Amino acid sequence: MAFFCFIVLTYFIGAIPSGVWIGKAFKGVDVRDYGSKNSGATNSYRVLGAKLGVAVLIMDVLKGFIPLYIASKFNLVYNDLVILGLVAILAHTFSCFISFKGGKGVATSLGVFLFLIPVITLILLAIFILVAYFTKYVSLASITAAFLLPIFTFFTHKDSYLFALSVIIAVFVIYRHKTNISRLLSGTENKFKF
């Protein structure tokens, strides 16, 4: 019963559409009407500016981290936390607050894995930053980090649930970037201005 309650709590926290709500509250705009029309942190940064974009990023990361942190205080087993991590990421991507649509799951995945495997996640974050900085493609950085996640997890952790989550999220995030991949291959992907 307690685990079910945490699934519900995690979903509603993860489903908070940070970019949409912050955009409407502070700028009177819906970020889904501009740029890539995505509600995630990258498009929010482009549409709303650096300060609000960073705020969206932080909120999206916390949506993955906070539910797991709270649940861990109630003696849930590690595998339950892994499942809650998946719920948080799916909630962000399929938010009940915006017609079951949402971002691509990268920032919320960062929050989830920062809690579950902080050292590996920080290494992947460093790789993400380097790829994004030198190529100016956030999408390529996201795809690279997602691809490396299950590889790093396999060699550093023996938990089957965690490895399964890393594979699912890697495939999911890369799939969510399918239009970005097409634009990268055609040379039409938008570069990110830092």
From Swiss-Prot:
Q: Please give the Pfam families that the UniProt record associates with this protein.
A: G3P_acyltransf
Record's GO cellular component, any one?
A: plasma membrane
- Pathway given in the UniProt record: Lipid metabolism; phospholipid metabolism
> Can you supply a Gene Ontology BP term from the record?
phospholipid biosynthetic process
Coiled-coil ranges per UniProt = none
Lipid bilayer topology: Multi-pass membrane protein
Annotated disulfide bonds: none
- Record GO terms (molecular function): acyl-phosphate glycerol-3-phosphate acyltransferase activity
Report TM segments.
2-22, 52-72, 80-100, 112-132, 137-157, 161-181
Give the keywords, sorted: Cell inner membrane, Cell membrane, Lipid biosynthesis, Lipid metabolism, Membrane, Phospholipid biosynthesis, Phospholipid metabolism, Transferase, Transmembrane, Transmembrane helix
Per its UniProt entry, what is the enzyme's top EC class, as one word? transferase
EC numbers on record: 2.3.1.275
Keyword Glycosyltransferase among record annotations: no
Question: Where is it located?
Answer: Cell inner membrane
- In terms of one coarse class, where is the protein primarily found? membrane
Q: Catalysed reaction(s)? A: an acyl phosphate + sn-glycerol 3-phosphate = a 1-acyl-sn-glycero-3-phosphate + phosphate
Q: What does this protein do?
A: Catalyzes the transfer of an acyl group from acyl-phosphate (acyl-PO(4)) to glycerol-3-phosphate (G3P) to form lysophosphatidic acid (LPA). This enzyme utilizes acyl-phosphate as fatty acyl donor, but not acyl-CoA or acyl-ACP.
Q: Which family does it belong to?
A: Belongs to the PlsY family.
Quaternary assembly? Probably interacts with PlsX.
HAMAP family found in the cross-reference section: PlsY (MF_01043)
Quote the protein name from its UniProt record: Glycerol-3-phosphate acyltransferase
